[in-house]
Regions:
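Secondary-structure junction motif
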Residues: 149, 178, 188-210, 280-291, ...
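Hydrophobic hinge/microswitch elements
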Residues: 130-135, 139-142, 149, 203-256
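Short helix-boundary/capping micro-motifs
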Residues: 12-30, 95
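Conserved amphipathic alpha-helical core elements
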Residues: 23, 41-42
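Flexible hinge/capping segments at coil-to-helix
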Residues: 157-195
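A short LG(V/I)-centered, amphipathic sequence patch enriched
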Residues: 42-61
Length: 298
């Protein structure tokens, strides 16, 4: 048995309007068409649905039950239309973002606040890790988009779009700087991120470019740990400028002067937006990308 939805709609309109004539006018159909719909329902279910001799019409028990259930059907229909319409406009749904550690900690919140303001009904989850881990999550379908530090080599299925540049600055604790000569950076202890992180890759590029070969390296799993070890005076590190500005301002850290080391105490890297090349860009991902690329920093 298939429900005749047009007949159900006519039945509900008769009950709500109180008469066949008003129901016909509201639905822009003839009164005989309304009567035919009611007869069709009564024949289908083999029950009498209403007493037509009264105005407004009086429903039987079966009619009351059908009216309640039909209203539920049409209310669900409205919810479906509204929900899917809003999803097509990126106003509902969920977005899973993968962000490398520095971006998740220091960049992303500014843009998530604005995105949530524009699309308050969208659920957001953020997974963080080093850049290789984020690329793996993307390929496994565990995130919708990624924002990472640097490129991902040898990954043809990942599309990379440059988002912005970030400066990493060579810093140390004031007492470390006072107690060590900067003429031989290879002899000093370096604090670095783990293999696979964008920060570790850029630090290695800096060391290679300047022919620095540290004899002692301490590797840790996140930039906050690097920062704390540097503050404690354990060694040198390249850290994101956005992360150390206040520490330098409060004299907890110092930027190594170029005059002491004979080279620029910083290096720039690209922060990138990554998606899968074969995945269709949904309106939700498109709108998050628009916020990320175009909403200005305060």
């Amino acid at each position: 048995m298939r429900l005749p939805f047009q007949a159900l709609r006519a039945f509900v309109e008769v009950v709500e309007a109180g008469s066949f004539t008003r129901a016909a006018n509201n639905l822009f159909i003839s009164q005989p068409a309304i009567s035919k719909s009611i007869r069709e329902l009564e024949a289908l279910f083999e029950v009498k649905l209403m007493d037509r001799s009264h105005s407004p019409v009086i429903l039987t028990d079966a009619g009351n039950a059908l009216f309640t259930l039909s209203k539920n059907i049409f209310n669900i229909e409205k919810v479906i239309i509204q929900d899917l319409s809003q999803r097509s406009q990126s106003r509902l749904g969920s977005l899973s973002i993968g962000a490398s550690t520095t971006i998740a900690s220091h960049w992303l919140s500014h843009y998530l606040v604005e995105f949530s303001r524009r699309y308050p009904a969208v659920s957001i989850s953020v997974l963080s890790g080093n850049s290789q881990h984020i690329a793996k999550l993307l390929k496994n379908g565990e995130i919708d988009v990624g924002v990472i530090e640097g490129p991902i080599p040898n990954e043809p299925e990942i599309q990379i779009i440059n988002w912005r540049k970030e400066r990493l600055v060579l810093v140390a604790a004031p007492h470390f700087l006072e107690g060590n000569t900067m003429t031989n950076l290879s002899a000093l202890k370096w604090i670095m991120r783990e293999e696979g992180s964008g920060t570790a890759r850029v630090t290695q590029e800096y060391l290679t470019k300047l022919a620095i070969q540290p004899v002692s390296i301490i590797r840790v799993a996140n930039n906050l740990a690097v920062l704390e070890l540097v503050r404690a005076g354990l060694g040198l590190a390249l850290l994101p400028e956005i992360m150390i500005k206040e520490k330098v301002m409060h004299k907890e850290l110092v930027v190594i002067p170029e005059t002491l080391i004979g080279m620029e105490p910083f290096i720039e890297r690209e922060l990138n937006w990554i998606t899968l090349t074969w995945r269709h860009e949904t309106p939700l991902r498109k709108n998050f990308k628009e916020v990320l690329f175009n909403f200005p920093l305060a």
